[in-house]
Each structure stands twice: as structure tokens, then as C-alpha cells.
């Protein structure tokens, strides 16, 4: 039964119309110092919801959300949670409209042995913005 359900889910993804690239922009630099205490990946359709999340994860010291025209755009915040050094980074690989969803594909870069890093807690994250598409957003972590 599980195999049947899994097979149907895979077939649904394979049989859909081809993926359509979604243009996006990275606004991470407009929110310096954000510290996300656990992995996250979610879409925000309003400034107030994004601000509420920032306040929830950084009480008393949350940065203000960047200027985003939420009448036209939506934002997606992805974060890997705390990491032990400066060598970690997140990269948005691509954003695609696929069937009835928008897929945001993310890859975490980890430092290799011998790479110069500083041992301190870091919080890799990306905040991206794209034109509002009235479909659910799925964050897909590649390589995990």
C-alpha cells in the first residue's frame, strides 16, 4: 500500500506539465543578523506575518523586515538553524512553478576539512522574494 501511494505521488510529479522558472530576488542582505534557532522554510504573504515570525525567534532584538510590496510579491524564508562555524552557507538553486505548487530548491554548503573557518555559532539563511503566485510554496532541501 505504501509503495502504491509513493508511486502515485512520484507519477503525479513526473506527469505534470513542465516546470516553469520563476524569477526571484535575494533580499537576505536587507535583514542582517537574523538568528533562526531551528531549520525553517516557509512563505509569507504579509509584512506583519514576517515581522511576527522575526519577533518570535528573536524576542526583543528582532530586525525589521525589509521593504517588500506584499500586494504584488511574496517572500520565502529558509534557514538551516545554528551551525558551528562560519563555513556554512545556503544557496537557492532555483524556484519553479510546477503544476499546482511553487518549488523553492535550496542547497546547504558545508565547509570542507582544512577550509579556513572561524569557530562560532552562525545561522545561515536566505530571504527571497518573487511575484505572488496563488499556489502553495514547497521548500525542497537538495542533498539532504
PLM features: residue spans?
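Exposed, flexible binding/inhibitory loops of compact, secreted disulfide-stabilized domains
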Residues: 3-144
Amino acid at each position: 500500500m505504501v509503495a502504491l501511494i509513493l508511486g502515485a505521488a512520484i507519477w503525479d510529479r513526473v506527469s505534470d506539465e513542465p516546470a516553469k522558472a520563476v524569477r526571484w530576488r535575494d533580499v537576505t542582505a536587507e535583514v542582517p543578523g537574523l538568528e533562526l534557532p531551528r531549520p525553517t522554510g516557509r512563505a509569507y504573504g504579509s509584512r506583519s506575518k514576517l515581522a511576527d515570525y522575526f519577533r518570535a525567534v528573536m524576542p526583543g532584538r528582532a530586525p525589521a523586515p525589509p521593504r517588500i510590496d506584499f500586494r504584488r510579491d511574496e517572500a520565502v524564508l529558509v534557514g538551516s538553524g545554528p551551525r558551528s562555524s562560519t563555513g556554512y552557507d545556503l544557496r537557492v538553486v532555483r524556484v519553479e512553478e510546477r503544476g499546482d505548487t511553487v518549488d523553492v530548491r535550496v542547497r546547504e554548503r558545508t565547509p570542507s576539512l582544512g577550509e579556513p573557518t572561524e569557530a562560532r555559532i552562525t545561522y545561515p539563511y536566505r530571504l527571497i522574494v518573487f511575484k505572488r503566485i496563488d499556489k502553495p510554496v514547497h521548500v525542497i532541501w537538495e542533498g539532504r
